[in-house]
Curated annotation (Swiss-Prot):
GO CC annotations on file: cytoplasm
Cited SUPFAM superfamilies: FMN-linked oxidoreductases
Keyword list, A-Z: Cytoplasm, Flavoprotein, FMN, Isomerase, Isoprene biosynthesis, Magnesium, Metal-binding, NADP
Family to which this protein belongs: Belongs to the IPP isomerase type 2 family.
Cofactor(s), names only, from the UniProt record: FMN; NADPH; Mg(2+)
Binding site residues for substrate: 4-5, 92-94, 155
Protein name from the UniProt record: Isopentenyl-diphosphate delta-isomerase
Species, as recorded: Methanopyrus kandleri (strain AV19 / DSM 6324 / JCM 9639 / NBRC 100938)
Main location: cytoplasm
Reactions catalysed: isopentenyl diphosphate = dimethylallyl diphosphate
Amino acid sequence: MRERKWEHVLACIWEDVESEESPLFDCVKIVHRALPELDFDDVDMEIELFGKRLSFPLIIAGMTGGHPKTGEINRKLARVARELEIGIGVGSQRAGVKDPEVRWTFEVVREEYPDGLVLANIGLPQLRENGPDLALEVVDMVDADALAVHVNVLQEAVQLEGEADAAGFVDVLAEVCETVDVPVVLKETGAGVSAEDAKLVRDIVDGIDVGGAGGTNWAVVEAVRSKAHGEIPLGYAFSDWGVPTAASILEVRSVVGNDLAIIGTGGVRTGMDVAKVLALGADCAGMALPVLRKVLAEGVRGCVRFLKSIAREVKIAMLMAGCSSVEEMSSVPIVVYGKLREWLECRGVPLDLVCTGDRRTGWNR
């Protein structure tokens, strides 16, 4: 398992592992306000998420851990999060549970960021196999403020060592939510969450990380690994699979209303992407691959500089939309066109409510 974790990191660094599908942020326009009637200094990007304050609405999404070399990566990422006062998740902690010698590669995140928002991470297959006490163990491992329970059926199905049995997941998730005393987030890992899935869990979980198509595609990551091991790379057949991130945010929000926190991850690459994630109705954005590559290429300082520029872009976009708070972004007028418009029309999502209403209220409940 250690080597698999490192192979994942190497694939993400050196290979083209991004989805052939777009997150469809390019199909969203925030309507410009020539007269925003707002001082730039009065634009407040702070939010509270799972009981912790973030200086701006971004989480460094969980990526790695479980191999000795990944511990130093997580240490650097935690230092970035601490300096910027944003959230951070860890990669799947399955390896840390099975191998005590690599627990430190996860624990280092809380050591470096004692007061910040930290999300633990474990998969539904492991919770079904080991029971809800496993959730308690991974939360305790990083002294987490919230628990991300990831579902990655596509990745498991194409993975050499995968476990593609996805039966009974909703019941497992409900049992976990009753067991732990921190908020639980259902986390997709690159294929998105549909309205149908959101309906299954909206009365169970505290949040949904849509993990939409358009960013890192873990089926492709597994295809890279399969080729390296001389196996047929099945994952390439699913390089454009999934619900695009922009569509997933709207689908999930349509059925959960304002009852759950939504984290928009999947292909978030710029501050404008973050602004569109917020405008579509998410509470917060998540970014993984660009942060990983930046911290490895330029260290903590370079990564901090990069994310500060992201934050500046978001603040400018909020000013140009006439919004003094993140919450206001969900009700700014937007224009939706192209593939996203076609998706919404095919899925019966009312475009008038999407474009002119408060997208946090829900309309398909």
